[in-house]
Amino acid sequence: MDKSKRPFIKSKRSFRRRLPPIQSGDRIDYRNMSLISRFISEQGKILSRRVNRLTLKQQRLITSAIKQARILSLLPFLNNEKQFERTESTTRTANFRTKNK
């Protein structure tokens, strides 16, 4: 077929492969907080394998390391920053109301 007769074929874009999130020299360990913290969301949840772009074996090792760090209280189970902000704002409004009376 002639190229002019193929109207729906798109030109290929250049593909740049992303670097793997875990290098070959990185050790997946519960004490390696700089590595573990990359795979935890802002709320303290373990991110999924699809989001992390990890292999199955790496995801299992990361998950077990995070859980072990939580048990040894190196990591919090939840990040409740929003909850603390709410309690501070409610106490401020309560104090403001009592001062006006």
Swiss-Prot record:
- What organism does the UniProt record list as the source? Spinacia oleracea (Spinach)
Family annotation (PANTHER family)? 30S RIBOSOMAL PROTEIN S18, SMALL RIBOSOMAL SUBUNIT PROTEIN BS18M
The misc remark on file is: Two forms, which differ in pI, are produced, S18 alpha and S18 beta.
Per its record, what are the GO molecular function terms?
small ribosomal subunit rRNA binding; structural constituent of ribosome
> Where does this protein reside within or beyond the cell?
Plastid, Chloroplast
Q: Spell out the subunit comment.
A: Component of the chloroplast small ribosomal subunit (SSU). Mature 70S chloroplast ribosomes of higher plants consist of a small (30S) and a large (50S) subunit. The 30S small subunit contains 1 molecule of ribosomal RNA (16S rRNA) and 24 different proteins. The 50S large subunit contains 3 rRNA molecules (23S, 5S and 4.5S rRNA) and 33 different proteins.
Name of this protein = Small ribosomal subunit protein bS18c
TM ranges are none
